[in-house]
Amino acid sequence: MRKFLAPVLFVFTAAALLTGCKKNAESSLTPVTLNEVAHSIFYAPQYAAIELGYFEEEGIDLTLVNGAGADKVMTALVSGDADIGFMGSEASIYTYIQGDDDYAVNFAQLTQRAGNFLVGRTPEADFKWENLIGKKVLGGRAGGMPQMVFEYILKKNGIDPTKDLSIDQSISFGLTAAAFTSNDSDYTVEFEPFATALEQEGNGYVVASLGKDSGYVPYTAYSAKKSYIEKHPEIIRKFTNAIQKGLDYVNTHSAEEIAETISPQFKETDTEKIAIIVDRYKEQDTWKENTVFEKESFELLENILEEAGELDTRGPYEYLVNTEFAKAAAEK
């Protein structure tokens, strides 16, 4: 009887120890809530970091929330419902100028190109922006990066956004593609996967990349309240390390490999379509090599805000951007 019980007790004890170790390992992870502006393949490095376990490697138990808009992400950040916000950096400038003492500080930049595309009714191999003169376009929310970058491109090409064409800004973010299939607009400005979906359904054709035609723009970045960064620098450091690993991955792997990795984040989209979208973003040099938010990029962003009539007073780069964690992550 003893001979039988000994191995059984050993197995039971070993299992208990392993379970205990697992629980201890899990409890050692620091919970962090990240509120993102949208859930899009445009942010592939972030999802690669999630799916490949880079946050866990850094000791972070990440909860991801889709804020559906930069204004909502900033609200969550300011209220404390989110630890870290991921959005266009214009939101942090607005908050600072409004006089908030505990303002949002950008500590890591992810994308360096606009992620939206101009979709028309017919193919236009030799598209020129002047083709939009006299046309109706489904645009974005006033003051948001998609709309401001669109207007910035129009002005660069000598087109007045308020006089030379009609821009419909009445449709909510994420619903313009559906509206485009049933209304009389000539063009729509779309993120992925909506641009590719319109093409595959035969309801539209990508005629221009706003990312290519606007140039390098600090489109989306990670930010946290000044007090949070001061209180939890180690969390910010580890979070930035995980994002850097995600960037390293997408910059060294094929579109097909990336699509396979991030596919659990986009269950409604088949892997082949994800690969097409990733390839489109890779081709326009969407993702940075590192997360350092350079001063020149910040100043370009404020130029765009000023030209859009959304900024009367500039926010100081030295207050609104912290590159300490990004530089350290890039050197690892």
Regions of interest found by a model, annotated:
Residues 301-332:
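Conserved C-terminal helix/tail region of periplasmic/extracytoplasmic solute-binding proteins
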Residues 17-20:
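C-terminal motif of bacterial Sec signal peptides marking the signal peptidase cleavage site
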Residues 91, 173-266:
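Pocket-lining segment of extracytoplasmic ligand-binding domains
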Residues 1-4:
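Positively charged n-region of N-terminal signal peptides that target proteins for export
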Residues 230-312:
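Secondary-structure end/capping motifs
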